[in-house]
Amino acid sequence: RSAFRLVLEYDGSRYMGWQRQGEGQTRAGVRTVAGTLERVLREAGLSVLTLGGSGRTDAGVHALGQVAHLHLGPGAPSPKELRRLLDEGLPHDVALRELAPCGPAFHARHDARSRSYLYQLSLRRSALAKPYLWWVKGALDLARLEETWRLFEGFHDVSAFADLEREDPRCEVQACELAREGSLVLLRVTASHFLRRQVRRMVGAAVWCGLGRERPARVARDLARPSEAA
Protein backbone atom coordinates (compact mmCIF):
# COMPACT_ATOMS: atom_id res chain seq x y z
CA ARG A 1 0.00 0.00 0.00
CA SER A 2 1.42 3.38 -1.08
CA ALA A 3 0.12 6.79 0.00
CA PHE A 4 0.41 10.07 -1.91
CA ARG A 5 -0.56 13.69 -1.37
CA LEU A 6 -1.85 15.43 -4.49
CA VAL A 7 -2.65 19.05 -5.30
CA LEU A 8 -4.96 19.49 -8.27
CA GLU A 9 -6.10 22.41 -10.39
CA TYR A 10 -9.24 22.11 -12.48
CA ASP A 11 -11.84 23.93 -14.50
CA GLY A 12 -15.09 22.71 -13.00
CA SER A 13 -17.35 23.73 -15.89
CA ARG A 14 -17.91 20.13 -17.05
CA TYR A 15 -18.04 18.54 -13.61
CA MET A 16 -20.66 17.96 -10.95
CA GLY A 17 -18.18 18.89 -8.26
CA TRP A 18 -15.31 16.93 -6.75
CA GLN A 19 -17.03 14.02 -5.05
CA ARG A 20 -17.46 10.72 -6.85
CA GLN A 21 -21.14 9.88 -7.43
CA GLY A 22 -21.01 6.09 -7.59
CA GLU A 23 -20.54 3.43 -10.25
CA GLY A 24 -21.09 4.28 -13.89
CA GLN A 25 -20.95 8.01 -13.28
CA THR A 26 -19.62 8.83 -16.73
CA ARG A 27 -22.12 6.61 -18.55
CA ALA A 28 -24.93 8.20 -16.56
CA GLY A 29 -23.70 11.66 -17.49
CA VAL A 30 -22.59 12.50 -13.95
CA ARG A 31 -18.97 13.50 -14.30
CA THR A 32 -16.95 14.43 -11.19
CA VAL A 33 -13.29 15.32 -10.74
CA ALA A 34 -12.59 12.49 -8.28
CA GLY A 35 -14.38 10.00 -10.52
CA THR A 36 -12.34 11.13 -13.51
CA LEU A 37 -9.08 10.84 -11.58
CA GLU A 38 -9.98 7.37 -10.34
CA ARG A 39 -10.92 6.23 -13.85
CA VAL A 40 -7.53 7.36 -15.22
CA LEU A 41 -5.73 5.46 -12.46
CA ARG A 42 -7.72 2.26 -12.99
CA GLU A 43 -7.27 2.40 -16.76
CA ALA A 44 -3.52 2.52 -16.07
CA GLY A 45 -3.88 -0.80 -14.23
CA LEU A 46 -3.54 0.61 -10.71
CA SER A 47 -5.46 -0.56 -7.65
CA VAL A 48 -7.13 2.48 -6.07
CA LEU A 49 -7.84 1.79 -2.41
CA THR A 50 -8.75 5.30 -1.24
CA LEU A 51 -9.12 8.69 -2.89
CA GLY A 52 -10.37 11.69 -0.94
CA GLY A 53 -10.32 15.46 -1.23
CA SER A 54 -10.00 18.26 1.28
CA GLY A 55 -13.62 19.17 0.64
CA ARG A 56 -16.52 18.72 -1.73
CA THR A 57 -17.10 21.43 -4.31
CA ASP A 58 -20.41 22.32 -5.90
CA ALA A 59 -21.10 21.70 -9.57
CA GLY A 60 -19.20 24.11 -11.80
CA VAL A 61 -16.76 25.25 -9.13
CA HIS A 62 -13.12 25.58 -10.21
CA ALA A 63 -10.05 24.79 -8.10
CA LEU A 64 -6.61 26.35 -7.94
CA GLY A 65 -5.31 23.94 -5.29
CA GLN A 66 -7.58 21.05 -4.27
CA VAL A 67 -5.60 18.81 -1.91
CA ALA A 68 -6.28 15.07 -2.05
CA HIS A 69 -4.94 11.85 -0.55
CA LEU A 70 -4.48 8.73 -2.65
CA HIS A 71 -3.81 5.19 -1.45
CA LEU A 72 -2.77 2.61 -4.05
CA GLY A 73 -2.49 -1.15 -3.65
CA PRO A 74 0.48 -3.41 -4.43
CA GLY A 75 2.43 -2.60 -7.55
CA ALA A 76 2.11 1.18 -7.22
CA PRO A 77 4.54 3.13 -9.42
CA SER A 78 7.15 5.59 -8.23
CA PRO A 79 6.03 9.20 -7.71
CA LYS A 80 7.77 10.18 -10.95
CA GLU A 81 6.01 7.47 -12.94
CA LEU A 82 2.65 8.21 -11.29
CA ARG A 83 2.97 11.88 -12.25
CA ARG A 84 3.72 10.88 -15.84
CA LEU A 85 0.65 8.62 -15.96
CA LEU A 86 -1.61 11.37 -14.64
CA ASP A 87 -0.13 14.09 -16.83
CA GLU A 88 -0.76 11.92 -19.88
CA GLY A 89 -4.13 10.52 -18.82
CA LEU A 90 -6.01 13.43 -17.26
CA PRO A 91 -8.28 15.52 -19.51
CA HIS A 92 -7.34 19.04 -20.53
CA ASP A 93 -9.34 20.68 -17.73
CA VAL A 94 -7.69 18.82 -14.83
CA ALA A 95 -4.01 19.38 -13.99
CA LEU A 96 -1.77 17.84 -11.35
CA ARG A 97 0.19 20.61 -9.62
CA GLU A 98 1.94 18.59 -6.93
CA LEU A 99 2.45 14.92 -6.07
CA ALA A 100 4.51 13.55 -3.20
CA PRO A 101 4.61 10.42 -1.02
CA CYS A 102 2.98 10.88 2.38
CA GLY A 103 2.30 8.90 5.53
CA PRO A 104 -0.66 6.51 5.45
CA ALA A 105 -2.42 8.50 8.17
CA PHE A 106 -2.59 11.71 6.12
CA HIS A 107 -6.21 12.64 5.35
CA ALA A 108 -6.86 15.64 3.10
CA ARG A 109 -10.15 16.59 4.79
CA HIS A 110 -9.45 15.74 8.43
CA ASP A 111 -5.98 17.31 8.41
CA ALA A 112 -7.04 20.56 6.71
CA ARG A 113 -6.92 23.57 9.02
CA SER A 114 -8.91 25.84 6.73
CA ARG A 115 -10.28 26.18 3.23
CA SER A 116 -10.48 29.23 0.97
CA TYR A 117 -12.72 30.30 -1.88
CA LEU A 118 -12.15 33.17 -4.30
CA TYR A 119 -14.99 34.84 -6.18
CA GLN A 120 -14.19 37.15 -9.08
CA LEU A 121 -16.71 39.89 -9.83
CA SER A 122 -16.34 41.92 -13.00
CA LEU A 123 -17.60 45.46 -13.43
CA ARG A 124 -17.50 45.08 -17.21
CA ARG A 125 -18.34 42.48 -19.79
CA SER A 126 -15.48 40.08 -20.59
CA ALA A 127 -15.18 37.91 -23.68
CA LEU A 128 -12.21 35.75 -22.66
CA ALA A 129 -12.69 35.28 -18.91
CA LYS A 130 -16.46 34.82 -18.91
CA PRO A 131 -16.46 31.29 -17.38
CA TYR A 132 -14.48 32.51 -14.38
CA LEU A 133 -16.23 35.81 -13.61
CA TRP A 134 -19.59 37.09 -12.46
CA TRP A 135 -20.36 40.19 -14.50
CA VAL A 136 -22.29 42.37 -12.08
CA LYS A 137 -24.49 44.75 -14.03
CA GLY A 138 -25.47 47.99 -12.37
CA ALA A 139 -23.84 50.46 -10.01
CA LEU A 140 -22.04 48.46 -7.33
CA ASP A 141 -21.33 50.30 -4.08
CA LEU A 142 -18.04 48.72 -3.03
CA ALA A 143 -18.13 50.16 0.49
CA ARG A 144 -21.55 48.66 1.09
CA LEU A 145 -20.44 45.41 -0.54
CA GLU A 146 -17.42 45.17 1.77
CA GLU A 147 -19.48 46.10 4.84
CA THR A 148 -21.84 43.21 4.11
CA TRP A 149 -19.05 40.80 3.18
CA ARG A 150 -17.28 41.31 6.50
CA LEU A 151 -20.47 40.56 8.44
CA PHE A 152 -19.83 36.88 7.72
CA GLU A 153 -16.57 36.86 9.70
CA GLY A 154 -16.80 34.99 12.99
CA PHE A 155 -18.62 31.93 14.32
CA HIS A 156 -22.18 31.80 12.96
CA ASP A 157 -25.14 29.56 12.33
CA VAL A 158 -25.28 29.86 8.54
CA SER A 159 -28.57 28.00 8.04
CA ALA A 160 -29.95 30.96 6.08
CA PHE A 161 -27.07 30.77 3.60
CA ALA A 162 -26.64 27.03 2.93
CA ASP A 163 -28.41 23.83 1.94
CA LEU A 164 -28.21 21.60 4.99
CA GLU A 165 -27.99 17.80 4.94
CA ARG A 166 -28.08 16.99 8.65
CA GLU A 167 -24.80 18.85 9.21
CA ASP A 168 -24.06 21.16 12.07
CA PRO A 169 -25.08 24.56 10.63
CA ARG A 170 -22.39 26.40 12.56
CA CYS A 171 -19.26 27.54 10.77
CA GLU A 172 -16.23 29.59 11.76
CA VAL A 173 -15.41 32.08 9.02
CA GLN A 174 -11.87 33.21 9.71
CA ALA A 175 -11.56 35.98 7.13
CA CYS A 176 -13.60 37.76 4.46
CA GLU A 177 -11.39 39.94 2.25
CA LEU A 178 -12.12 42.28 -0.65
CA ALA A 179 -9.62 43.62 -3.18
CA ARG A 180 -10.06 45.76 -6.29
CA GLU A 181 -7.90 45.10 -9.35
CA GLY A 182 -8.98 47.29 -12.24
CA SER A 183 -12.43 46.17 -13.31
CA LEU A 184 -12.26 43.11 -11.04
CA VAL A 185 -13.50 42.87 -7.46
CA LEU A 186 -12.01 39.85 -5.69
CA LEU A 187 -13.87 38.33 -2.75
CA ARG A 188 -11.89 35.79 -0.74
CA VAL A 189 -13.29 33.82 2.19
CA THR A 190 -11.42 31.44 4.51
CA ALA A 191 -13.21 29.17 6.96
CA SER A 192 -12.89 25.98 8.96
CA HIS A 193 -15.27 24.36 6.47
CA PHE A 194 -18.13 25.28 4.17
CA LEU A 195 -21.63 23.91 3.74
CA ARG A 196 -23.35 23.25 0.43
CA ARG A 197 -23.88 26.43 -1.61
CA GLN A 198 -22.82 28.55 1.36
CA VAL A 199 -20.19 30.60 -0.48
CA ARG A 200 -22.43 31.31 -3.46
CA ARG A 201 -25.18 32.60 -1.22
CA MET A 202 -22.81 34.68 0.89
CA VAL A 203 -21.46 36.33 -2.25
CA GLY A 204 -24.97 36.77 -3.63
CA ALA A 205 -26.15 38.48 -0.44
CA ALA A 206 -23.15 40.82 -0.40
CA VAL A 207 -23.62 41.77 -4.06
CA TRP A 208 -27.35 42.31 -3.55
CA CYS A 209 -26.54 44.77 -0.78
CA GLY A 210 -23.86 46.42 -2.91
CA LEU A 211 -26.48 47.00 -5.60
CA GLY A 212 -28.81 48.57 -3.07
CA ARG A 213 -31.44 45.84 -3.38
CA GLU A 214 -31.04 44.69 0.22
CA ARG A 215 -29.72 46.17 3.45
CA PRO A 216 -26.65 44.86 5.32
CA ALA A 217 -28.83 44.86 8.44
CA ARG A 218 -30.92 42.10 6.88
CA VAL A 219 -27.82 39.92 6.44
CA ALA A 220 -26.78 40.62 10.04
CA ARG A 221 -30.24 39.60 11.22
CA ASP A 222 -30.21 36.37 9.21
CA LEU A 223 -26.87 35.46 10.80
CA ALA A 224 -28.04 36.34 14.31
CA ARG A 225 -31.51 34.77 14.00
CA PRO A 226 -31.42 32.27 11.12
CA SER A 227 -34.75 30.71 12.09
CA GLU A 228 -36.44 33.99 11.12
CA ALA A 229 -34.86 34.20 7.67
CA ALA A 230 -37.41 34.25 4.88
Regions found by a protein language model. Name each.
Residues 1-230:
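Structured-RNA-binding interfaces characteristic of tRNA pseudouridine synthases
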